Each structure stands twice: as C-alpha cells, then as structure tokens.
Amino acid sequence: MSFQITPTRDLKVITDELQTLSSYIFHTNIVDDLNSLLTWMSPNDAKSNHQLRPPSLRIKNIIKVLFPNNATTSPYSMINTSQANNSIVNEGNTNKELQLQLFSTLKEFYIFQVRYHFFLHFNNINYLKDIQRWENYYEFPLRYVPIFDVNVNDWALELNSLRHYLLNRNIKFKNNLRTRLDKLIMDDDFDLADNLIQWLKSANGSLSSTELIVNALYSKINKFCEDNMSRVWNKRFMIMETFNKFINQYWSQFSKLVGCPEDDHELTTTVFNCFESNFLRIRTNEIFDICVLAYPDSKVTLLELRKIMKDFKDYTNIVTTFLSDFKKYILNPSVTTVDALLRYVKTIKAFLVLDPTGRCLHSITTFVKPYFQERKHLVNVLLYAMLDLPEEELKEKINFNVDMKALLSLVDTLHDSDINQDTNITKRDKNKKSPFLWNLKVKGKRELNKDLPIRHAMLYEHILNYYIAWVPEPNDMIPGNIKSSYIKTNLFEVLLDLFESREFFISEFRNLLTDRLFTLKFYTLDEKWTRCLKLIREKIVKFTETSHSNYITNGILGLLETTAPAADADQSNLNSIDVMLWDIKCSEELCRKMHEVAGLDPIIFPKFISLLYWKYNCDTQGSNDLAFHLPIDLERELQKYSDIYSQLKPGRKLQLCKDKGKVEIQLAFKDGRKLVLDVSLEQCSVINQFDSPNDEPICLSLEQLSESLNIAPPRLTHLLDFWIQKGVLLKENGTYSVIEHSEMDFDQAQKTAPMEIENSNYELHNDSEIERKYELTLQRSLPFIEGMLTNLGAMKLHKIHSFLKITVPKDWGYNRITLQQLEGYLNTLADEGRLKYIANGSYEIVKNGHKNS
C-alpha cells in the first residue's frame, strides 16, 4: 500500500469559500466567529491557536452552530452527522449539498494547515518524539470539531501519509528511529518498542518493521553472548546453555514483536545459528588468551569451537588473529626465551585440539620459526626442559638469568603428556577390529581379520567404498603447495621444526650428552636421557626412512626432495652417541676388573673415551690450561690406573683429560663444619694447596699459588673466587687463607659470600648517594641488557635505552637514568670485556666460549 499527498487549493480561496458558504447556509453573519474557530484550529498560529487547551465559550458556540448535538466526542467528537445536517436547515437537496461542501471545505482547510505546518518543520523532525508531539498537536482540535466523523479513515489516511513521507524522505529521522528501537530492546523496554513498531507499521514506509526487529534481535543476541560467553572457557555446552537462557528470558517478547508463534522451529533454528556465529566471533577474538594463557583449562571451549568451525575461512581468521597477538605479546625482545617457548608449547597443544589435522599449526609454525631462530639459546632451553635438568647445569650453558619458575612450568607442560604422542590421535582400542577385511601394514605385511565374515564382503568392495567416500582435503587450509603428509601433529616434531635443521638439534643434544657423560658419577645414566635419546632416534630413523622411500601423491610416483646429506649427518651424530654410550659401558666393565687388582685405590672410577667420537681433542685445548699440577697423591693413583690399562690393553696408552675430571672432596674445619663438594681437578688442586699436615694456618699469595700450580693469575683468580663464594677461603691483605672458624652458620656464609663479592662491584669513586643509587640501578639492569643482546644481537644505545625503560621494573627507578649515564655504563662493561663496542655505534655480547644456539 502506498500513499500520495495530493496538492490542495490556495488557502485564501479555501477561506473565502468557507465564509461564503457559512453566510449563505445560516443566513446570519458568523464570519467573525468562524474566523476565530479557524484560527483556534490552525497549528500555524502558535499565539492564537488552541495551544492544547480547550476552546473558549465563543468558539464552543460556533462549534455548536456548525455541529449541533456534539455532546460526546469519540474518538474525534463523534456525532450523528445526518441529524446535524438536518437540524441546521431542511430546505431540500440544494442546502444539503451546500452543507456537505462546507464540511468538505473545512476538512480541506485543516489538511492544508496541517500539511503546511508539517513541511515547515520537516527538517526539525529528527526523533520519534518530535513527530508524536506534532501528531498530538494536530489531533487535539479534532476532539472538539468533528470534521472527519463522516469517514474516520480520512484523517488516519492523511496522518499515515505524512508518516510515510517523513520515513522515506528524512534520512536522519529514519536512522534515529532505528537507533531508538535498538536502545529500547537493549534496555528491555519492550512496551515502548512495541509502540514504535506499531507506528512503523502504520507508516508503511521504506523502513521495514520486521527488518528493524531482526536487526535489533541480532544486536541483542550479540550483547547477550558478550555478557555470558566472554572469558568463560571452562564450561561445556556454552552455546546451548546461553541459547536456552536467552529463550527463557526474552523469546516471548520477541515473538510478540515479530508476530510469530513462540514454537516456530525454523526461526529458533536461525536464532541458534546466530549464537553459534557469536561464539565463533568471541572465541576468535579471545583465541590468544585461550591457547596461551588459559590452556589446558580452556580445552573444553576449544572442543566446542572445533565442532562449529565448518569453513576454512573460520580457521584462517583464527590463525590470523592469533598470530597478530602472538607476535605482539610473545615474539618481542622483552619476553625471555623460556617464556616464549612455554607459550609456544601451549599453543601447539591447544591448536592440535582445535584442528587435529595440523594445518593451522603448520601456518603458525611457519610464521614464528624465523623469530624463534633469532633466539640463540632456544635449543639449550628446550633440551634442558625435555631432560628436566637442574638449574646449575642450565646456567653453565646460558649466560643470562633464567626464570626458574617459568622453566619448571615449561617442564611440566612438556611432560604432562608424552611428548612423543600425536596429540590429535585418539588412542585406539586394541580389541577393536578394522572395518576392512585386511589390516594392511606399512612394510607390506597383512593380517587377516578373522572376525569379519568373508562371504559377505569382498576385498575390492571395501576398497571401492573407501575411495568413493573419500573427500579431498581443502588446499586453502595451508599456504603454498605443502602436502598433508608434511604436516606435523606430534609435539616433538613440531618443536623440532623451529630449528634450521634436525642435525643442529641432534648435534646440540650430543654436546649436552657429552658434557653429562664427562661429569657423570659412576657409569649409570639417568633414565630421562635414555628416553630423550630414544625419542630422537625414533624420529630421526623415521624421517630418514621417509626421505629415502618412494611415495605416491595424486597418483604419481615420486621422490621427496633431497634430504640425504642432512639424514647422513643425523645418523653420524647418532652413531657417535652410540659409541660414547658403548665407551661408558666398557669403562664400567674395565673399572670393575681394575678394582680387583691389588694396590689400586677403588674410589677412582675412570672413563676411557674414544677421542674421535667424543668431540674432544687435547691438542685443541690451551697448553697452559692443561699444564697445572695435580696433587701428588692423586697424580700417583691416576698413573697406576694408566699402567694397569696398558697391561690390560697392550699397545694402548692413556692420556688424562685434566679439564674433564671431577673429584668429590670433603672439607673439615676446626669449628666442626664439614663441606662435601664435587669440583673439577683444577679446583681440587687449588684447595689442596691449603692442606696443612700439622694443622698450622697457611696464607698464600696469588703469585705463590700461580708458581706452585703452574696456573696463570687470571685463571687462578677465577678459581680462588669459587672457594671464596663457598665460604672456604678468605682474601685479606693480598693473601688467601682458610676460614677455620666461622662467625655464622656455614649455610648463611654461602649465601652472604657471593653477595659481598657482588656488592664490592658497586663501590664507586664518587661518594654521592644519588650517583650510587644510579649505579646500583644500572648494575641491577645488567641481566636485562645481556638478555636483549643475547636474543637480538647487536643493538644501538638509544634502542637499548628504550627497551630498558619498558622491561626494567618501575620501582627500580630506571626512568631517572639518562642516555649519557647508560652509555658510560656500557662503555665500562666494554672495557671489562663483558660487552663489545662495534664501529657503527652498537653493542654486542661477548661470547664466553660456549656454543650458542
């Protein structure tokens, strides 16, 4: 239905006609009274019109003259029009026609005035309350002047025409109307919303009431889902619970607005789909927190999310959103390698729950791999976490402070489930038979499934059905032309992909294992090492077999790209590990035989190694470092073992690896203290110099010790500092002596001695308290500086200063440090050899001799 407002005559023509008709019909001069009535009715004369107040006595009299019997007015002062017409005159058809013409002209006059007023204020009608105010203004005179009583629909048609025009032409009003409905529904004011809908329906304009209700419903669902789903990750069936809650709370009101039954299954299904879409939208925005911060508590929400993800675009949006946040919060220099790796391991587990095919994880690994490869100590952190090694061994390999709490969390995360287990594969029931007639094996073997009746199914039928039901995997899920066979779904394999090559990881494991075997007490290796070695061996052998085997892709027989050199290097490292383990086993057997020889001290447990496979060559070691003198008794006993070995192995000769031996010593002090330590041969030789046969105190200078031990003073100072930190030696007036009587508990001495040594570095030439505080702040910031330079490489001064402002705790007061003060401190570190200044104005960390990852 459409409305069209037809133009009317000029107002003066209409007014003159009213005066003429009234004078002719009533035969009296009522022109003045009629003009007063017209002025009172007109909405355009704001000062003299009704102003929403009842008419005066004079106007009431003229209304009675025009409309006698106007006792009641409902809804617009309804009266019996035929009686009114007959009561005025009854002079034939001519007078009746004049009366009808008078009423028609009066209606025309009022419609003209209403339209004029409406279009005069058209641009100022911005809200529903504005038009409702004018509508009330227009309808007020009609309560007393029943000019539309012959056909009430005439006024309704006129009013709806104005509404229709307003809705179609006033864009601002239409937008505000839409906003108003949304707000009413958001505020649960469904009564006012229903009034607005009824107004819209009467206007029948370009703005559909159904469309508005649906949009408002969708907005209401969005808000309801935000309030009930956001950051709730540990509840099952979240979509269904939220949907049921919404239906119970609001559906009766919405069904009334829409005008449909409450049990409309098609509509409720559509609404439920909206809840699924909102769940997907909310979880996509929260995917970083779900996978990185809340996992594994958020596993239930990942499973629910997996059920509703039907399109590869859903996965793409999730991966894109996740990587944006992961890069922002994790892949930045202020996050330590331990924390970054911990978050990444959680990411792997979470995304394998979300997408068991591993395609999402493949995209994530491809993105983060370059960032992790910039972290030099990644392989050390991963290996120490896999092996759950103590903090002391980790610090020997990594020259920056490690958050042990985060490292323990990483260990727990790696070991809460088998690292070698495919996270996405559900364990199969061993008693459950395959649906195929034959269980085909990888190496061509086959086993007959005897429980399946052969007579009811032929082998080709099973194969045919399998290929008929086969659905191709979407290529859009992963970038490029990566085949699904390359996608990793094993936690260890995914972590292994972070490195440039498998050979690099295995080589680092070999180095770590070598150090462990060198320091191993007796000959038994911890089980965690054997488990890790078994895991590496299985994956490397599997990878090697795959690399050298044929495969079929898209029906074409082909070969994988060349990986033979890497596979050969992997196998070479594994062979070296096997030789080292064999050396340990043979050493145990040989040691047992040696201990049976009379005259040998059985407390010595030698290891006989093959230098070529242990990556150890005495010729490569500094001659001065290995020329120190051992204690005479120890050297004599070791020589006995060497002679016995030559007797047991004719033609072979032993060479002592002085820098690899370990000695367990027990120190006893005069105050009753006892200390048991595992130390190196060098450390043992140093403390042995203070062993007094007659219990007299020994005081030795650095020069005396250097000459006696044949150790260079810088190296010897480092060895002496070790014993000072242990609370064994005391340096006073340039000489070293044993602390036989301690004023404090020995454990407390161990804690305070390193602090005293560290605090000695804080002594400044400037006695100013403020300068000392600044220097202390810079000293405390040193681990952050080393961490940044280690993870990111060389950095310029202003960049280091900016990062320190972000990373150093605020209560340390680093914000008060100027760029010049930092530059002076960095130059001091460079002079001490701890940092290196590059010509381009950058600083880098000085390598300490260990192989960095």
From Swiss-Prot:
GO terms for cellular component: anaphase-promoting complex; cytoplasm. This is Anaphase-promoting complex subunit 2. It is found in: Cytoplasm; Nucleus. GO terms for biological process: anaphase-promoting complex-dependent catabolic process; exit from mitosis; metaphase/anaphase transition of mitotic cell cycle; positive regulation of mitotic actomyosin contractile ring contraction; protein K11-linked ubiquitination; protein ubiquitination; regulation of meiotic cell cycle; regulation of mitotic cell cycle. The APC/C is composed of at least 13 subunits that stay tightly associated throughout the cell cycle: APC1, APC2, APC4, APC5, APC9, APC11, CDC16, CDC23, CDC26, CDC27, DOC1, MND2 and SWM1. APC2 interacts directly with APC11 thereby anchoring APC11 to the core complex. The keyword Ion transport does not apply. Keywords: Cell cycle, Cell division, Cytoplasm, Mitosis, Nucleus, Ubl conjugation pathway. Present with 432 molecules/cell in log phase SD medium. It comes from the Eukaryota. Pathway: Protein modification; protein ubiquitination.
